[in-house]
Every structure is written in C-alpha cells, then in structure tokens.
A protein has these predicted regions:
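Short secondary-structure boundary/capping elements
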Residues: 36-43, 88-91, 115-120
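Short catalytic-loop micro-motif centered on adjacent basic/acidic residues
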Residues: 56-59, 83, 133-135
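A glycine-rich helix N-cap at a beta->alpha junction
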Residues: 73-90
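Glycine-rich phosphate/adenosyl-contacting loop at the front of the ribokinase-like
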Residues: 1-60, 65-69
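Active-site-proximal loop->helix
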Residues: 65-77, 97-99
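Conserved phosphate-binding/catalytic loop of the ribokinase/pfkB sugar-kinase fold
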Residues: 86-87, 97-135
Length: 135
C-alpha cells in the first residue's frame, strides 16, 4: 500500500450557494450552505485515502470549532492525525466561499487564523521520510 503524507495549512471551508452576487450593503438569503475540509493538502489527502492509500496529515490545528471539524473530517475519510499538534488559544484557518449559480463562479474570503508554524519533531520527520508521496 502507498503512504501519502501531507504537510501544510488545512482550512475549514464554509460553502455558501447564492443565486447571484448581492449588491454591496444589502442582505440576501443563501440557497444552501455546508462546511467542508479544504486546502490543497487536506483535499489531496482525502482523495488519496479514498483511493486506498494510507494517508496522514502532519501539521498544526487549533482546538477551536474549525480545528475540531477538520480532525473529525480527516477521521471520517480515514486520514490519520496522530502526528498533528492541536493547540489551545489559537484561531483556525477558515474560508467563506460564495458560489454564484448565475455566474457559475466562486469568490473566497479567508482568515488565515493565527496558528504558529509547524516545527517538526522526530516522529513527524520519521513519518515524512517513510512516505511514498509527500504533499
């Protein structure tokens, strides 16, 4: 079996479906909304796990609602998080993505949060060295 390891930012996306983009300083009801894990690393790891690879995320997440969502989402798809640091007192990387039905387009507004950069420990280094694929 192939092993994929991902390092980097993972994002809690809120996808908001709207019929069209609203004018500035107005209100509009969304047609629907949902939350999903996002970012290139998270998306790639989930895809690898769905295809049967052993997948693992190495990174830093917050213990806030966004970080908790991402941990649960990874577990749901079989992505290991044993080497993920979960820290208190920080904000998760989040994004709000508006999907316009009329324009068939998307607009993303994001908050990178304030998590510190990852400092690799020996276990994390070992997992990276043992990977067949690094994302």
């Amino acid at each position: 079996m192939n092993k994929a390891v991902g390092i980097g930012a993972c994002v809690m996306d809120t996808l908001i479906n709207v019929p069209n983009y609203p004018k500035e300083d107005t209100k509009m009801r969304a047609e629907s909304s949902k939350q999903a894990g996002g970012g290139p690393v998270a998306t790639g790891l989930v895809a690898a796990a769905k295809l049967g690879a052993e997948a693992e995320y190495i990174g830093v997440l917050s213990d806030d609602a966004g970080g908790g969502f991402l941990i649960k989402d990874f577990k749901k798809y079989g992505v290991k998080t044993d080497n993920t640091e979960v820290l208190s007192g920080y904000r998760s990387f989040t994004s709000f993505i508006w999907l316009s039905a009329k324009a068939s387009s998307r607009t993303c507004v994001f908050d990178k949060g304030n998590l510190p950069p990852l400092k690799l420990n020996d276990e994390q280094k070992k997992a990276i060295i043992g990977a067949d694929l690094l994302m």
